[in-house]
Amino acid sequence: MIVHLIDGTYELFRHFYGLRRGNPDEDPPDGAVKGVLQTVGHMVRTGATHIGVATDHVIESFRNDLYPGYKTGEGIEPALWAQFHPLEKALAEMGFVVWPMVELEADDALASAAHLAAADPRVEKVCIWTPDKDLSQCVVGDRVVQVDRKSGKIRNADGVREKFGVGPELIPDYLALVGDSSDGYPGVPKIGAKTAARLLNKHGPIESFPDDVLGEHRADALLFKKLATLRTDAPLFKNVDELKWTEPK
């Protein structure tokens, strides 16, 4: 059994702006929704059987209480935002399992679902369909992998190390050091990708760094790590069989 976990928020953005590139003068009111439905439907037609889709029902989450600069819904175009809830409804009507997240984020749902699915010995592989670097922390060997639909790459644990210079278990630390502009936190000044990887490979997680490595920025780095660490405890399902797609009657 292969479990497919889809970042519905990313897919909606992808199709919305993909349509705009083709027709910049018009935003079809349900164009992105139709695009996502076609994408997920194609997965079923090509053999996918167990599918879950995570969406951000609201953009804000518990992380906004931890850090005031964390991403919000500000700046999301009304024409795009208007398609979030219709997408959730349409996917459910098509027979797909949908997780519309409120207190947690869609990324937390994907991480939790991957954790739950991987615990079932019947599951051969878990594919997380998103290019979001946050989700690289969920990769486990060749069994839980990240699929970047944009590039077509399937990233296993070795692929994560090749891309970031550290293993999946250190991705939250890596992001804490280099920052993540899409999520709204800056990282530690003067630490780029290569320096972050070097420090993490030398010392291990941020908690193990000697005090003088980060100095006055240590507390911020630990906070950013908390922001970057995905939750894996969302009670999304009890049995992976619940993810099996069934054609609506």
Segments (PLM) and residue ranges:
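Conserved SAM-binding loop
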Residues: 128
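Non-catalytic nucleic-acid-binding/docking modules located in mid-to-C-terminal regions
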Residues: 47-52, 122, 151-249
